[in-house]
Curated annotation (Swiss-Prot):
Pathway(s): Amino-acid biosynthesis; L-serine biosynthesis; L-serine from 3-phospho-D-glycerate: step 2/3; Cofactor biosynthesis; pyridoxine 5'-phosphate biosynthesis; pyridoxine 5'-phosphate from D-erythrose 4-phosphate: step 3/5
Subcellular location: Cytoplasm
Name of the protein this chain belongs to: Phosphoserine aminotransferase
Organism this protein belongs to: Pseudomonas entomophila (strain L48)
The protein's assembly and partners: Homodimer.
Xref: Pfam families: Aminotran_5
Enzyme Commission number: 2.6.1.52
Broad class of enzyme this protein falls into: transferase
Positions that bind pyridoxal 5'-phosphate: 77-78, 103, 153, 173, 196, 238-239
Length: 361
């Protein structure tokens, strides 16, 4: 096997080598059945067993309470921007949203197509370098739900606390930091996460929803987007993204073998401490995000001279350090260090950054 590169892509992101090797071994002949998982009927006993095990492993990893449904859906997190208000926002109601970057802004824009949205707080007041404290938020009296994104992949802002919503259902986009550290699922009404960062390949979104929030969809809500329909049909109202679901199940198995989300928290803390520590000690690289809002998963940084960006990226690619270019909306660099990347990937990046700084500072 040729040497694997270190993939710092924000998504679709790196997958564990062990997962890819397992999928490769099972590609043509899954457990002696003589066919690939991609060829299985989603109604077959074998595939149903794959799907059920994936769900149970995810429940185990996150300690999901029994009064929550776990759904494996299609359309990615972006479809949830519409699906959430269609299911949870009454036509004459209002939903509270917190805007901390591009993804939460997209969620707000989509929700406005279906009803009234109150932007309770915005990081724009801090130039998207910090998250407003909840004492600054202007929440509605009777909001249908409170929505926020726990981690903004593009700007590199992450909540290190859970908002207090009282009796209002708390809805969170955890696409980029789910499974990176322990969470208390019972604090949320609904959690959703696109798969292609910390769960598996693209084509899948996981939704964890409290049962009392089911059955609230508008009459105009398409059947395919009704959470209750999805829950009642075991996420198989139509043919699901079978192979993405299977691969995600392999990732869940790998996570359990690694020690679960508690072990991932330690691993991710070491990675982010190493990378931010190097950036902060350098006079050549900068990250302006407030320290208590810095993302553990997505680390944006800039070089002292942006004219060196192309040379930096070319040198990184030559060393097998891939996809470090920042998002087109913000520029600079971005290292996405999800669960699948180990500390050795960060050490390789820091080593190259130090070398490049020595040559160009």
């Amino acid at each position: 096997m040729s040497k694997r590169a270190f993939n710092f892509c924000a998504g679709p992101a790196a997958l564990p080598d062990a997962v890819l090797q397992r999928a490769q071994a099972e590609m043509l002949d899954w457990r002696g059945k003589g066919l690939s998982v991609m060829e299985m009927s989603h109604r077959s006993d074998d595939y149903v067993a794959i799907a059920e095990k994936a769900e149970q492993d995810l429940r185990d990893l996150l300690s999901v309470p029994s009064n929550y449904k776990v759904l494996f859906l299609q359309g990615g997190a972006s479809q949830q921007f519409a699906e959430i208000p269609l299911n949870l926002l009454p036509e004459n109601g209002v939903a509270d949203y917190v805007e901390t970057g591009i993804w939460s802004k997209k969620a707000i824009e989509e929700a406005r197509r279906f009803g009234s949205v109150n932007v309770a707080a915005s990081a724009k007041a801090y130039d998207y370098l910090a998250i407003p404290g909840q004492n600054e938020w202007k929440l509605s009296k009777n909001a249908a739900y409170l929505h926020y994104a726990s981690n903004e992949t593009i700007g590199g802002l992450q909540f290190d606390w859970v908002p207090e919503a009282g009796d209002v259902p708390l809805v969170v986009d955890m696409s980029s930091d789910i499974l990176s550290r322990p969470i208390d699922v019972s604090q949320y009404g609904l959690i959703y996460a696109g798969a292609q960062k910390n769960i598996g390949p693209s084509g899948l979104v996981v939704v964890i929803v409290r049962e009392d929030l089911l059955g609230r969809a508008r009459s105009s809500c398409p059947t395919m987007l009704d959470y209750k329909v999805s829950a009642d049909n075991g996420s198989m109202y139509n043919t699901p993204a079978t192979y993405s679901w299977y691969l995600s199940g392999l990732v869940f198995e790998w996570l359990k073998e690694q020690g679960g989300v508690e072990a991932m928290e330690q691993r991710n803390r070491a990675k982010k401490d190493r990378l931010y520590g190097f950036i902060d000690s350098s006079e050549f690289y900068t990250n302006p995000i407030s320290h208590n809002a810095r993302s553990w998963m997505n680390v944006p940084f800039r070089l002292a001279d942006e004219r060196l960006d192309k040379a930096f990226l070319a040198g990184a690619d030559a060393r097998g350090l891939l996809n470090l270019k920042g998002h087109r909306s913000v520029g600079g660099m971005r290292a996405s260090i999800y669960n699948a990347l180990g500390l050795e990937a960060v050490e390789a990046l820091v080593g190259y950054m130090a070398e490049f700084e020595k040559e160009h500072a």
